[in-house]
Amino acid sequence: GEDRFLREINDAVQIPTIRKDFIIDEYMIYEAKLLGASCVLLIAALLDTETIRQYKAICDQLGLSALVEAHDEAEAASALAAGARMVGVNNRNLKDFTVDIHNSTRLRELVPRNVLFVAESGIKTAEDIAELVSAGVNGVLIGETSMRSPDKARMLDELRSRV
């Protein structure tokens, strides 16, 4: 999306927002702060461990949270080695776009319980959320399901019904 969308959303809501983008330069972190984001997404598939560590340090200096996204064991290990306090597991394989929400339940076992754990992508039902919560997931990122829903408020109510 466009940067202005993040600013418009921040002007309209009183809850934290995330810049869910392909952060590939530290400039984008400063830009996220100026746009009003509370958090940025750092994708381990795009960034090596040292870069994640450096970007996370910039986030800390700016008062931003960093959600470090992983899809597999190696990426989760990189996120943790970089000092991530919040790890997101993308259930969508970015190489072939297949989705498996059990990716989150499998990788949850590798992430210490004192690290916030977020399941991302492929979450469609309240039952999906209940299964993830029972596996120790602390939060979910829901994108496509909400974007495709004609009645977003009702869809969110249904998803929250089991949590």
Predicted segment positions?
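Glycine-enriched alpha-helix->loop->beta-strand junction motifs that scaffold or abut catalytic
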Residues: 12-15, 34-40, 60-64, 81-88, ...
